[in-house]
Protein backbone atom coordinates (compact mmCIF):
# COMPACT_ATOMS: atom_id res chain seq x y z
CA UNK A 1 0.00 0.00 0.00
CA UNK A 2 1.32 3.48 -0.90
CA UNK A 3 0.49 7.05 0.02
CA UNK A 4 -2.41 8.70 -1.81
CA UNK A 5 -2.30 12.29 -3.12
CA UNK A 6 -4.61 13.94 -0.55
CA UNK A 7 -3.80 15.47 2.82
CA UNK A 8 -6.85 16.06 5.03
CA UNK A 9 -7.43 17.40 8.54
CA UNK A 10 -9.31 15.86 11.47
CA UNK A 11 -12.02 17.26 13.70
CA UNK A 12 -10.62 17.29 17.22
CA UNK A 13 -8.15 15.91 19.73
CA UNK A 14 -8.95 12.28 18.94
CA UNK A 15 -10.23 10.52 15.84
CA UNK A 16 -13.96 10.16 15.31
CA UNK A 17 -15.60 7.58 13.04
CA UNK A 18 -15.83 10.05 10.15
CA UNK A 19 -12.11 10.84 10.49
CA UNK A 20 -11.23 7.14 10.36
CA UNK A 21 -13.44 6.60 7.32
CA UNK A 22 -11.86 9.45 5.40
CA UNK A 23 -8.27 8.70 6.37
CA UNK A 24 -8.66 5.02 5.44
CA UNK A 25 -9.56 5.93 1.86
CA UNK A 26 -6.80 4.95 -0.63
CA UNK A 27 -6.72 8.52 -1.97
CA UNK A 28 -5.51 9.87 1.39
CA UNK A 29 -1.80 9.98 2.12
CA UNK A 30 -1.49 12.51 4.90
CA UNK A 31 -3.01 14.47 7.75
CA UNK A 32 -2.38 18.09 8.68
CA UNK A 33 -2.89 19.03 12.33
CA UNK A 34 -4.18 22.36 13.65
CA UNK A 35 -4.27 23.96 17.07
CA UNK A 36 -7.75 22.51 17.64
CA UNK A 37 -6.18 19.04 17.47
CA UNK A 38 -3.92 19.72 20.45
CA UNK A 39 -4.76 19.55 24.14
CA UNK A 40 -1.53 18.37 25.75
CA UNK A 41 1.60 16.39 24.83
CA UNK A 42 0.26 12.96 25.85
CA UNK A 43 -2.93 13.47 23.84
CA UNK A 44 -0.94 14.55 20.75
CA UNK A 45 1.30 11.49 20.94
CA UNK A 46 -1.75 9.23 21.22
CA UNK A 47 -3.45 10.95 18.27
CA UNK A 48 -0.37 10.59 16.05
CA UNK A 49 0.02 6.95 17.05
CA UNK A 50 -3.58 6.21 16.09
CA UNK A 51 -3.24 8.04 12.76
CA UNK A 52 -0.06 6.14 11.89
CA UNK A 53 -1.71 2.81 12.77
CA UNK A 54 -4.62 3.27 10.34
CA UNK A 55 -2.74 1.99 7.30
CA UNK A 56 0.07 -0.46 6.55
CA UNK A 57 1.91 2.42 4.87
CA UNK A 58 1.60 5.06 7.63
CA UNK A 59 -0.02 8.34 6.71
CA UNK A 60 2.20 11.40 6.75
CA UNK A 61 1.50 13.78 9.62
CA UNK A 62 2.37 17.42 8.97
CA UNK A 63 1.80 20.69 10.79
CA UNK A 64 2.42 24.41 10.37
CA UNK A 65 4.89 24.84 13.22
CA UNK A 66 7.23 27.66 12.21
CA UNK A 67 7.66 29.70 15.38
CA UNK A 68 6.32 33.09 16.38
CA UNK A 69 2.68 33.53 15.39
CA UNK A 70 2.49 30.25 13.51
CA UNK A 71 3.05 27.54 16.09
CA UNK A 72 0.13 25.15 16.39
CA UNK A 73 1.28 23.50 19.64
CA UNK A 74 2.26 25.82 22.48
CA UNK A 75 1.61 24.58 26.03
CA UNK A 76 4.16 21.85 26.68
CA UNK A 77 6.29 22.90 23.69
CA UNK A 78 9.14 25.40 23.55
CA UNK A 79 7.93 28.81 22.37
CA UNK A 80 9.88 29.27 19.15
CA UNK A 81 10.93 32.75 17.99
CA UNK A 82 9.51 34.49 14.93
CA UNK A 83 12.03 34.04 12.13
CA UNK A 84 12.45 37.80 11.76
CA UNK A 85 14.19 37.82 15.16
CA UNK A 86 16.92 35.61 13.68
CA UNK A 87 17.20 38.04 10.79
CA UNK A 88 17.73 40.89 13.25
CA UNK A 89 20.62 38.97 14.82
CA UNK A 90 22.00 38.32 11.34
CA UNK A 91 22.37 42.06 10.79
CA UNK A 92 25.01 42.24 13.53
CA UNK A 93 26.31 38.67 13.91
CA UNK A 94 25.67 36.45 10.84
CA UNK A 95 27.51 33.43 12.21
CA UNK A 96 25.69 33.64 15.53
CA UNK A 97 22.37 33.92 13.67
CA UNK A 98 23.16 30.78 11.66
CA UNK A 99 24.01 28.88 14.85
CA UNK A 100 20.79 29.98 16.53
CA UNK A 101 18.76 29.14 13.42
CA UNK A 102 20.15 25.60 13.40
CA UNK A 103 19.39 25.19 17.10
CA UNK A 104 15.87 26.52 16.49
CA UNK A 105 15.34 23.98 13.72
CA UNK A 106 16.57 21.21 16.00
CA UNK A 107 14.27 22.13 18.89
CA UNK A 108 11.32 22.56 16.52
CA UNK A 109 11.84 19.17 14.89
CA UNK A 110 12.96 17.13 17.89
CA UNK A 111 9.89 18.10 19.92
CA UNK A 112 7.52 17.31 17.06
CA UNK A 113 9.24 13.99 16.34
CA UNK A 114 9.02 13.03 20.02
CA UNK A 115 5.23 13.25 19.71
CA UNK A 116 4.96 11.42 16.38
CA UNK A 117 4.67 14.31 13.90
CA UNK A 118 6.56 13.57 10.68
CA UNK A 119 7.31 17.07 9.42
CA UNK A 120 6.56 20.76 9.65
CA UNK A 121 5.76 23.04 6.73
CA UNK A 122 8.85 25.12 7.44
CA UNK A 123 10.92 27.16 6.88
CA UNK A 124 9.33 30.20 5.26
CA UNK A 125 11.63 31.36 2.45
CA UNK A 126 9.69 34.47 1.42
CA UNK A 127 11.46 37.83 1.45
CA UNK A 128 10.42 40.40 4.04
CA UNK A 129 9.45 43.41 1.93
CA UNK A 130 7.40 44.87 4.78
CA UNK A 131 4.24 44.76 2.64
CA UNK A 132 2.61 41.44 3.51
CA UNK A 133 0.89 41.15 6.87
CA UNK A 134 0.30 37.42 6.41
CA UNK A 135 4.04 36.87 5.92
CA UNK A 136 5.44 39.67 8.09
CA UNK A 137 7.69 38.37 10.86
CA UNK A 138 7.41 34.82 9.55
CA UNK A 139 10.12 35.80 7.04
CA UNK A 140 13.78 35.87 8.04
CA UNK A 141 14.95 38.95 6.16
CA UNK A 142 14.69 41.12 3.06
CA UNK A 143 18.10 39.97 1.75
CA UNK A 144 17.85 36.77 -0.35
CA UNK A 145 21.26 35.56 0.81
CA UNK A 146 20.33 36.02 4.46
CA UNK A 147 17.08 34.13 3.90
CA UNK A 148 18.99 31.27 2.31
CA UNK A 149 21.67 31.11 4.99
CA UNK A 150 19.15 31.13 7.83
CA UNK A 151 16.70 28.84 6.04
CA UNK A 152 19.46 26.34 5.34
CA UNK A 153 20.51 26.44 8.99
CA UNK A 154 16.95 25.72 10.14
CA UNK A 155 16.77 22.89 7.60
CA UNK A 156 20.01 21.38 8.91
CA UNK A 157 18.75 21.59 12.49
CA UNK A 158 15.56 19.82 11.46
CA UNK A 159 17.63 17.17 9.69
CA UNK A 160 19.68 16.69 12.88
CA UNK A 161 16.40 15.69 14.55
CA UNK A 162 15.32 13.34 11.75
CA UNK A 163 12.87 15.66 10.02
CA UNK A 164 12.64 16.81 6.41
CA UNK A 165 12.04 20.50 5.67
CA UNK A 166 9.39 22.04 3.41
CA UNK A 167 10.20 25.51 2.06
CA UNK A 168 7.40 27.94 1.26
CA UNK A 169 5.83 29.82 -0.51
CA UNK A 170 7.44 29.25 -3.93
CA UNK A 171 8.32 31.43 -5.82
CA UNK A 172 7.74 34.12 -3.15
CA UNK A 173 4.70 35.55 -1.34
CA UNK A 174 6.37 38.49 0.40
CA UNK A 175 5.94 41.15 -2.31
CA UNK A 176 2.13 41.13 -2.43
CA UNK A 177 -0.12 42.84 0.09
CA UNK A 178 -3.23 40.64 -0.30
CA UNK A 179 -3.59 37.57 1.91
CA UNK A 180 -4.20 34.40 -0.12
CA UNK A 181 -6.30 32.94 2.71
CA UNK A 182 -9.03 35.47 1.87
CA UNK A 183 -8.10 36.86 -1.57
CA UNK A 184 -6.20 36.05 -4.77
CA UNK A 185 -2.96 38.09 -4.65
CA UNK A 186 -1.38 39.27 -7.90
CA UNK A 187 2.35 39.99 -8.28
CA UNK A 188 2.91 41.92 -11.52
CA UNK A 189 6.71 41.77 -11.60
CA UNK A 190 8.58 40.14 -14.47
CA UNK A 191 10.24 36.75 -14.17
CA UNK A 192 13.60 38.51 -14.29
CA UNK A 193 12.73 40.67 -11.30
CA UNK A 194 11.47 37.67 -9.33
CA UNK A 195 14.48 35.55 -10.30
CA UNK A 196 16.94 38.20 -9.12
CA UNK A 197 15.35 38.40 -5.68
CA UNK A 198 12.59 36.07 -4.43
CA UNK A 199 13.71 32.98 -6.34
CA UNK A 200 17.27 33.14 -4.99
CA UNK A 201 16.67 31.45 -1.61
CA UNK A 202 14.46 28.79 -3.22
CA UNK A 203 17.11 28.04 -5.86
CA UNK A 204 19.89 27.83 -3.29
CA UNK A 205 17.80 25.69 -0.95
CA UNK A 206 17.12 23.26 -3.81
CA UNK A 207 20.87 23.03 -4.38
CA UNK A 208 21.31 22.43 -0.63
CA UNK A 209 18.96 19.44 -0.70
CA UNK A 210 15.55 20.78 0.34
CA UNK A 211 13.13 17.84 0.61
CA UNK A 212 9.81 19.55 -0.12
CA UNK A 213 8.23 22.74 -1.39
CA UNK A 214 4.88 24.47 -1.04
CA UNK A 215 3.87 26.90 -3.82
CA UNK A 216 2.05 30.17 -3.25
CA UNK A 217 -1.59 30.85 -4.13
CA UNK A 218 -0.34 33.96 -5.96
CA UNK A 219 -0.75 34.87 -9.63
CA UNK A 220 2.33 36.19 -11.45
CA UNK A 221 0.68 37.30 -14.73
CA UNK A 222 3.96 38.22 -16.44
CA UNK A 223 4.95 34.55 -16.11
CA UNK A 224 1.64 32.62 -16.24
CA UNK A 225 -2.06 33.35 -15.82
CA UNK A 226 -2.43 30.52 -13.28
CA UNK A 227 -1.53 30.87 -9.58
CA UNK A 228 1.83 29.22 -8.91
CA UNK A 229 0.24 26.21 -7.21
CA UNK A 230 -1.79 25.48 -10.35
CA UNK A 231 0.89 26.41 -12.88
CA UNK A 232 2.86 23.92 -14.95
CA UNK A 233 5.13 26.81 -15.90
CA UNK A 234 6.13 27.39 -12.28
CA UNK A 235 6.06 23.81 -11.02
CA UNK A 236 7.28 21.88 -14.07
CA UNK A 237 9.28 24.24 -16.25
CA UNK A 238 10.87 26.45 -13.57
CA UNK A 239 10.93 24.38 -10.36
CA UNK A 240 11.54 20.90 -11.78
CA UNK A 241 13.40 21.59 -15.03
CA UNK A 242 15.29 24.84 -14.48
CA UNK A 243 15.98 24.58 -10.74
CA UNK A 244 16.35 20.80 -10.79
CA UNK A 245 14.09 20.18 -7.79
CA UNK A 246 13.39 16.49 -7.19
CA UNK A 247 11.59 16.71 -3.83
CA UNK A 248 7.92 16.59 -2.93
CA UNK A 249 5.52 19.43 -3.77
CA UNK A 250 2.59 20.07 -1.42
CA UNK A 251 -0.22 22.39 -2.46
CA UNK A 252 -1.26 25.06 0.00
CA UNK A 253 -4.78 24.59 1.38
CA UNK A 254 -7.11 24.32 -1.61
CA UNK A 255 -10.03 25.62 0.44
CA UNK A 256 -8.37 29.05 0.71
CA UNK A 257 -9.78 31.94 -1.31
CA UNK A 258 -6.54 32.12 -3.26
CA UNK A 259 -7.34 28.70 -4.75
CA UNK A 260 -10.86 29.60 -5.92
CA UNK A 261 -9.41 30.57 -9.30
CA UNK A 262 -9.45 26.88 -10.31
CA UNK A 263 -13.17 26.25 -9.73
CA UNK A 264 -14.86 23.81 -7.35
CA UNK A 265 -12.93 21.68 -4.90
CA UNK A 266 -12.59 18.64 -7.18
CA UNK A 267 -11.42 20.88 -10.03
CA UNK A 268 -8.92 22.54 -7.68
CA UNK A 269 -7.45 19.22 -6.60
CA UNK A 270 -7.21 17.97 -10.19
CA UNK A 271 -5.63 21.23 -11.34
CA UNK A 272 -3.04 21.21 -8.54
CA UNK A 273 -2.08 17.58 -9.18
CA UNK A 274 -1.99 18.07 -12.96
CA UNK A 275 0.24 21.12 -12.54
CA UNK A 276 2.81 19.15 -10.57
CA UNK A 277 1.80 18.97 -6.91
CA UNK A 278 2.44 15.56 -5.34
CA UNK A 279 -0.06 16.06 -2.51
CA UNK A 280 -3.11 18.33 -2.36
CA UNK A 281 -4.33 19.79 0.94
CA UNK A 282 -8.08 20.01 1.62
CA UNK A 283 -8.57 21.56 5.05
CA UNK A 284 -11.32 22.64 7.45
CA UNK A 285 -14.23 21.60 5.23
CA UNK A 286 -15.07 17.91 5.77
CA UNK A 287 -17.96 18.11 3.32
CA UNK A 288 -15.51 19.15 0.59
CA UNK A 289 -13.14 16.36 1.56
CA UNK A 290 -16.02 13.91 1.14
CA UNK A 291 -16.79 15.38 -2.28
CA UNK A 292 -13.20 14.89 -3.41
CA UNK A 293 -13.07 11.32 -2.09
CA UNK A 294 -16.29 10.51 -3.97
CA UNK A 295 -15.39 12.12 -7.30
CA UNK A 296 -11.61 12.22 -7.73
CA UNK A 297 -10.11 9.68 -10.12
CA UNK A 298 -6.37 9.99 -10.61
CA UNK A 299 -3.59 7.82 -11.98
CA UNK A 300 -0.97 8.43 -9.33
CA UNK A 301 2.62 8.10 -10.67
CA UNK A 302 5.24 6.11 -8.78
CA UNK A 303 7.78 9.01 -8.65
CA UNK A 304 5.28 11.18 -6.75
CA UNK A 305 4.63 8.38 -4.27
CA UNK A 306 8.37 7.92 -3.76
CA UNK A 307 8.91 11.63 -3.15
CA UNK A 308 6.17 11.65 -0.52
CA UNK A 309 7.54 8.57 1.23
CA UNK A 310 10.78 10.45 1.89
CA UNK A 311 8.85 12.90 4.08
CA UNK A 312 8.32 10.37 6.87
CA UNK A 313 10.18 11.27 10.05
CA UNK A 314 13.29 9.19 10.66
CA UNK A 315 12.40 6.53 13.26
CA UNK A 316 15.84 6.69 14.88
CA UNK A 317 15.18 10.33 15.82
CA UNK A 318 11.90 9.95 17.71
CA UNK A 319 12.70 9.61 21.41
CA UNK A 320 10.12 10.22 24.09
CA UNK A 321 10.08 13.70 25.58
CA UNK A 322 11.56 12.22 28.76
CA UNK A 323 14.52 10.85 26.81
CA UNK A 324 14.80 14.06 24.80
CA UNK A 325 15.02 16.17 27.95
CA UNK A 326 17.89 13.99 29.14
CA UNK A 327 19.78 14.55 25.88
CA UNK A 328 22.79 16.87 26.05
CA UNK A 329 22.17 17.97 22.44
CA UNK A 330 18.60 19.02 23.24
CA UNK A 331 19.59 20.72 26.49
CA UNK A 332 22.22 22.79 24.70
CA UNK A 333 19.84 23.77 21.90
CA UNK A 334 17.09 24.65 24.36
CA UNK A 335 19.50 26.85 26.32
CA UNK A 336 20.07 28.95 23.20
CA UNK A 337 16.50 28.98 21.87
CA UNK A 338 14.32 29.39 24.97
CA UNK A 339 13.31 33.02 25.28
CA UNK A 340 14.83 33.97 21.90
CA UNK A 341 12.62 36.64 20.34
CA UNK A 342 10.13 36.28 23.20
CA UNK A 343 9.39 40.00 23.41
CA UNK A 344 8.44 40.29 19.76
CA UNK A 345 6.54 37.01 19.80
CA UNK A 346 4.38 38.08 22.70
CA UNK A 347 3.40 41.35 21.05
CA UNK A 348 1.15 39.46 18.64
CA UNK A 349 0.24 35.80 18.98
CA UNK A 350 -2.65 35.95 16.51
CA UNK A 351 -1.99 33.27 13.92
CA UNK A 352 -2.44 34.75 10.41
CA UNK A 353 -2.79 31.31 8.82
CA UNK A 354 -5.23 29.49 11.10
CA UNK A 355 -8.55 30.97 9.95
CA UNK A 356 -10.63 27.84 10.39
CA UNK A 357 -8.21 25.70 12.34
CA UNK A 358 -7.87 27.87 15.40
CA UNK A 359 -8.97 26.12 18.56
From Swiss-Prot:
It holds the Pfam family Glyco_hydro_3. Belongs to the glycosyl hydrolase 3 family. NagZ subfamily. SUPFAM superfamilies: (Trans)glycosidases (SSF51445). Plays a role in peptidoglycan recycling by cleaving the terminal beta-1,4-linked N-acetylglucosamine (GlcNAc) from peptide-linked peptidoglycan fragments, giving rise to free GlcNAc, anhydro-N-acetylmuramic acid and anhydro-N-acetylmuramic acid-linked peptides. Substrate binds at residues 64, 72, 138, 168-169. The record marks 179 as: Important for catalytic activity. Pathway: Cell wall biogenesis; peptidoglycan recycling. The keyword Hydrolase applies. Its EC number is 3.2.1.52. It catalyses: Hydrolysis of terminal non-reducing N-acetyl-D-hexosamine residues in N-acetyl-beta-D-hexosaminides. InterPro entries: Beta_hexosaminidase_bac (IPR022956), Glyco_hydro_3_N (IPR001764), Glyco_hydro_3_N_sf (IPR036962), Glycoside_hydrolase_SF (IPR017853), NagZ_Beta-hexosaminidase (IPR050226). GO terms for cellular component: cytoplasm. This is Beta-hexosaminidase. The active site is at residues 181, 252. PANTHER family: BETA-HEXOSAMINIDASE, BETA-HEXOSAMINIDASE-RELATED. Its main location: cytoplasm. The keyword Repeat does not apply. Keywords: Cell cycle, Cell division, Cell shape, Cell wall biogenesis/degradation, Cytoplasm, Glycosidase, Hydrolase, Peptidoglycan synthesis. It is found in: Cytoplasm. One of its GO terms (molecular function) is beta-N-acetylhexosaminidase activity.
Amino acid sequence: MTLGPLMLDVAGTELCDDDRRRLSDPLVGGVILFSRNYRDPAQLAALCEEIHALKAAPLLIGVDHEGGRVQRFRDGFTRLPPMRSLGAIWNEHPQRARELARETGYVLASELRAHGVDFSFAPVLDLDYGASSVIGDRAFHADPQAVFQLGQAVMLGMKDAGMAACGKHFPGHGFVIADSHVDIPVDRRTLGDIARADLVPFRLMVEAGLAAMMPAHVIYPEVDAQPAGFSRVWLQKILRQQLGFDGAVFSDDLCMAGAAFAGGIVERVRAALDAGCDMALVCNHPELADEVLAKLDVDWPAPARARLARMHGHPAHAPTMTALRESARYAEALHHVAGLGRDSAELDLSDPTDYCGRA
